[in-house]
Curated annotation (Swiss-Prot):
Keywords: 4Fe-4S, Iron, Iron-sulfur, Metal-binding, Oxidoreductase, PQQ biosynthesis, S-adenosyl-L-methionine. This is PqqA peptide cyclase. The keyword Transferase does not apply. PANTHER family: PQQA PEPTIDE CYCLASE (PTHR11228:SF7), RADICAL SAM DOMAIN PROTEIN (PTHR11228).
Amino acid sequence: MTAVTPTLPAPIGLLAELTHRCPLRCPYCSNPLELDKRSAELDTATWQRVLGEAAALGVLHVHLSGGEPTARQDIVEITGACADLGLYSNLITSGVGGALAKLDALSEAGLDHVQLSIQAAEAGNAERIGGLRNAQPQKFAFAERVVALGLPLTLNAVIHRGNIDEVPALIDLAVRLGAKRLEVAHTQYYGWAYVNRAALMPAKPDVDRSIRVVEEARERLKGRLVIDLVVPDYYAKYPKACAGGWGRRLMNVTPSGKVLPCHAAETIPGLAFWNVQERALGDIWANSPAFQAYRGTSWMKEPCRSCDRREKDWGGCRCQALALAGDAAATDPACSLSPLHAKVQALAVAESALETAPDYQYRTIGGAPVVPQPEGVSA
């Protein structure tokens, strides 16, 4: 079978990481270990230009993220730019700090949707996971105002060892807060989550139980609450298509303007990431070496190259392949066809069986923690 690079589709989504500043310190944060400082952030005019270029390129959805996007003083102007350009805007927020104070203005500026993170259903556990006291009352007040304004609300709950027993309570909480959608997203182990893997890894029986709870709730709450489920890679049979396939559907613009094919792409050595301060977004999408590196199937090795699923999962996660197999072009070890798959599952079982989970290494703007990186499973 001949490997091909498919005709370049237009990107659908843009993840606009407006800032890495955030009042929460979640140990599973997908931001890089080396966080951009405020002084490096793009200014308002640059973000407005980037959004205009995104609309011209064919982008439909803009996810205003961070860090905490409402930490930006110009978040209302940026949201208004999305509305003026006909871009559907989704605010991905912690709901704490100054988020509530800006919510009415964001709604008036044309905000379309809110995604609110919830660390746990129980307040004390939520504070322990997020590293911030009194976060839960702020989140609940924020959610109440979102619903009062008539904005659709999605709750996002990242699931791990520390909160997996709360999945039923999280579902009840989503209903109580008036959310239209709940994302039960098991931790993806890159960024800070990779550092904290041993502290976060749940046991397989607990994962299976959480899946059954979600499936039952989907039937019970049909028409009231949509529940999305993201299963943990380390226990999966096949990998997910990272970001819909490398360089196929999504772009991620960092606070300092680098354009990435996915959150964790900077962990892959040798990739050159072009910056919106130097090049147009369309040029980056079409010609950036980083986007071309793993776009399509021509880069694939066996068994991916001849696999019937190669244009479904697009080889899985390149960053995970690097972290676990030591080769970004290797088969994602989350795939059952990888020669390392059994080792990955054994690693997950071993870490989840630790009698006492390690302490969290909390996300910090000051730089990467000085702790040993987890080992991969390369042969």
